[in-house]
A protein has these predicted regions:
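Flexible "cap/lid" subdomain of the alpha/beta-hydrolase fold that forms the substrate-access gate
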Residues: 2-4, 13-15, 27, 40, ...
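Structural motif
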Residues: 9-10
Length: 306
């Protein structure tokens, strides 16, 4: 049974949350990406809340800017330090400051927040699980040096346009459905994208798209252009990139926006790494292979840290 609630944070932001499991139990926190919402985690919330699967307190916030969470209009409000602050505050509330998260689980933009969180606040979580979300070190490397990644990420330069949210909303969100569909022209929509699931997406998108687009506007990690150096002007020290937590990475290899070159050399930044490459899965592996994602996470949670 999923409960929904509005969680005020001490610094004035409110996050709309979905949760399952008893408060006071070890906490799993799940972070979604763009253009999604917390609802994408419902099956995992219910699974891991069950006593036979760990009996966790499972919480999935809608990140700031999404669904009914606070959605500041200014781009600066979506800088990484603010996104990490939201999650650190939510962790303190959900764990009551008594113990670290059992695991922080994240996909896409949620993963970008989670990588930063794990680097800055390793004492607040025991483990990290990432699903098709590039580590900033490998992402920066590929954006600077790999023309294929620059082309794959070209959509980012569309999403930073001032009229991006207006264009995304046109024709019943035609472009957003395209993000979720199979990339081959003329191919049918994926089987997981049912009318019921579409209604869940619309319930998020109908509340506004500016917040989601502001994630892209606030980040320099995008392909360089003649008038905009973007990633080419960024250098990050190793101290900002190293993640010491035991980390699970699950990667659908058919991700057209985030190709598998992004997991090459990942162990240089994440020494305690468990990596699962999944053929025939895309960026939307949570929807395509929920059974596999659940099993990988279950095994990772049960494994002793090493």
């Amino acid at each position: 049974m999923i409960e929904t609630y509005q969680q005020p944070l001490p610094h004035g932001i409110t996050l709309s949350c979905r949760a399952a499991g008893e408060p006071g139990r070890p906490v799993l926190l799940f972070l979604h990406g763009f253009p999604e919402g917390a609802f994408v985690w419902d099956a995992l919330l219910e699974h891991f809340a069950q006593p036979q699967n760990g009996g966790y307190r499972c919480v999935a916030p809608n990140l700031r800017g999404f669904e009914q969470s606070s959605a500041p209009q200014e781009v600066a409000a979506y800088r990484p330090k603010h996104l990490v602050q939201d999650i650190a505050a939510l962790v303190a509330i959900e764990t009551r400051g008594a113990a670290p998260l059992a695991c922080l689980v994240a996909h896409d933009w949620g993963g970008a927040v989670a990588w930063n969180f794990a680097n800055q606040h390793p004492h607040l979580a025991r483990k990290l699980a990432i699903i098709n979300s590039p580590h900033p070190g490998t992402f920066l490397r590929e954006l600077k040096n790999n023309p294929a990644q620059q082309q794959a990420s070209a959509y980012m330069n569309f999403l930073i346009r001032e009229d991006a949210e207006t264009l995304l909303a046109e024709n019943d969100y035609q472009r957003l459905w395209g993000f979720l569909a199979n990339p081959t022209a003329g191919s049918p929509p994926p089987s997981w994208l049912t009318e019921a699931v579409k209604a869940q997406y619309r319930s998020v998108w109908d509340r506004g798209l500016r917040g989601g687009c502001n994630y892209y506007r606030s980040s320099p990690l995008r392909p360089p252009r003649p008038q905009d150096p973007a990633a080419a002007a960024v250098d990050l020290p190793l101290s900002m990139l190293t993640v010491s937590l035991p980390t699970l990475v699950v990667w659908g290899l058919n991700d057209t926006a985030l190709p598998p070159e992004l997991i090459q050399g990942l162990d240089a930044f994440v020494p305690n790494l468990t990596l699962h490459r999944v053929p025939d899965a895309t960026h939307w592996i949570i929807h395509e292979r929920p059974d596999l994602v659940t099993r990988f996470l279950q095994d990772f949670l049960q494994a002793a840290p090493h």
